[in-house]
Amino acid sequence: MDDALAHLPRAFAGKTVLVLGDVMLDRFIYGAVDRISPEAPVPVIAVEKETAMLGGAGNVARNVAALGAKAVLIGLVGRDDAGAALRGMIDAEAGLEAELVVDPARRTTEKVRYISGSHQMLRVDREDRSPGDGAALLAAFETRLASADVVVLSDYAKGVLTPAVVRGAIDAAKAAGKPVIVDPKSRDFARYDGATLIKPNRKEAAEATGIVETSDAASEDAGAAILAMAPGLQAALITRGGAGMTLAVRNQPPIHLPATAIEVFDVSGAGDTVAATLALAVAAGASLAQAAQLANLAGGLVVAKLGTDVVTAAELTACASSAQGEPGEIKIADREQAQRIVEGWRARGLKVGFTNGCFDLLHPGHVSLLSQAKAACDRLIVGLNTDASVSKLKGPTRPVQKEQGRATVLASLSSVDLVVLFDEDTPLELIKAFRPDVLVKGADYTVETVVGSDVVLGYGGKVVLAELKQGQSTTNLIARMNS
């Protein structure tokens, strides 16, 4: 893994990405399925939760903003409830601006997904694919082009990126010296000639080239065929799902990148995350190979999340900093990030455990407790007292190690899946937020005296008291060191 990758996300701040494409509203309806309809052989979903978010080109822009940069979104909406919802979401999104062309006669594109557990049961599309007002779209694009560092064309074949609009946008960007990243939908890849990089998935590449991707060699052939279609195109990055990605750069040998996702929960919007990361990496001065590597990591992160989600700069930096660059190595999270990770674990039916402590000078007693805690669950969260919290509990000479050092040591253990810092005297708020299936403390406590035991037992969880290793304590260690 390129050592420079971990530093790239820090360079995203201050960059502006101009996104032109098909904006849509993504709605997710979650529920339980426990019976078949008596009216027809179809499952009945008992709706539990509904969410809505920016989709399509809007999700590219949302990912840009989440990565710490500024996104300017150019798209097309109708004068309807879905269009109004999209405009409201854009206004509420930090780091995101938009120039939306409104067509009163048009329906705003909307995708509704019905999800139960880890399965998408049904998708309902409401859309108008007729060509939009190309002149108005290009006028908005050209107005914002000068302030952009890079351009993304996000094509979902919903009427925005007609051949004329694509040609006008690429020509204007080239004249202004702006790189162009294309997420294509048309089978005619020649229309994207002059772009910096095109990012088809395996299906789109096969439809455009006639080469079905069955191996690395076939993917190399497809990449070469794409470059032959568009002489002015610099590179093609074919995303291949579980097989990873293949990067074909003109006059360079192809590069194969293995998939990085450890667990795949939802691929919705993953291509948008990849496109946003590619664009920002290129804007930050990365080579196309580096940009592809970073985008590959981002794609692996986002498919492990629920619904159309985003990747943050902090998550990407942590992932790129790990030895293998694997999403599973991201173990230190803030409360909000941890909440999303836990939701994903729970949606996959994993048993979540929780323990907590200061873990100032890690010793065999700590290691034993953590090993026992992990044995009682599938994923273990460690709530870690911040420096201020430790000082309040243990006195002004503690902690010996600062919180970041303590978190890093804990995160290096195979028994620990997630470390979350907390400032409070007790981890009660974390326990209420994460609702662990198993709460673990040392056997020097009783079940009744474990903080949060009443909460966990109240919703049917379990409290485990781990056996202690005699004579092991941080206080004793410090005393021996000072004697």
UniProtKB/Swiss-Prot annotation:
The annotated region (Cytidylyltransferase) lies at 354-483
GO biological process assignments: ADP-L-glycero-beta-D-manno-heptose biosynthetic process
Q: Which PROSITE patterns match?
A: PFKB_KINASES_1
The protein's UniProt keywords, in alphabetical order, are: ATP-binding, Carbohydrate metabolism, Kinase, Multifunctional enzyme, Nucleotide-binding, Nucleotidyltransferase, Transferase
Q: Which GO molecular function terms does the record list? A: ATP binding; heptose 7-phosphate kinase activity; heptose-1-phosphate adenylyltransferase activity; phosphotransferase activity, alcohol group as acceptor
The highest taxon in the source lineage is Bacteria
Question: Which residues make up the binding site for ATP?
Answer: 201-204
EC assignment = 2.7.1.167, 2.7.7.70
Instruction: Give the reaction(s) catalysed.
Output: D-glycero-beta-D-manno-heptose 7-phosphate + ATP = D-glycero-beta-D-manno-heptose 1,7-bisphosphate + ADP + H(+); D-glycero-beta-D-manno-heptose 1-phosphate + ATP + H(+) = ADP-D-glycero-beta-D-manno-heptose + diphosphate
Tell whether Kinase is among the UniProt keywords. Answer: yes
Q: Which family does it belong to?
A: In the N-terminal section; belongs to the carbohydrate kinase PfkB family. In the C-terminal section; belongs to the cytidylyltransferase family.
| Protein name as catalogued | Bifunctional protein HldE
The uppermost taxa in this organism's lineage are: Bacteria, Pseudomonadati, Pseudomonadota, Alphaproteobacteria, Caulobacterales
